Amino acid sequence: AQGGTNVSGGQRQRLCIARMFVADPKVYVFDDSFSALDATTEANLNAAMREIVQDRTVIVVAQKVSSIKHADQILVMEAGRIVARGTHDELLQTSETYREIAASQAEVDA
């Protein structure tokens, strides 16, 4: 990129995420930070994150199930209210809202 001005949205997101890992905070907050990443990059990042942030608190705000399906706890919100809480597998069993979201993104069996 020319002076850093010619980067794509996905490249910009990867740079911001890399800066956060270098800073090594006790709490990581990702607010829809993976939306511009392709599926392969997102999967690689999620795998690396699980190792890097083992002893840290990680909060992920996401619309993509693939971004949060390995989380210890997922909060499902609808109309500004928490309507379900659990792991990916638990929510597939207990939350119609989560099942619908996962099915619409083809994440039911993944």
Specify the residue positions occupied by each region the protein language model found.
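C-terminal portion of ABC ATPase nucleotide-binding domains
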Residues: 4, 32, 40, 47, ...
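ABC ATPase nucleotide-binding domain helices that frame the ATP-binding cleft
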Residues: 15-16, 22
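Conserved catalytic loops of ABC-family nucleotide-binding domains
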Residues: 51-60
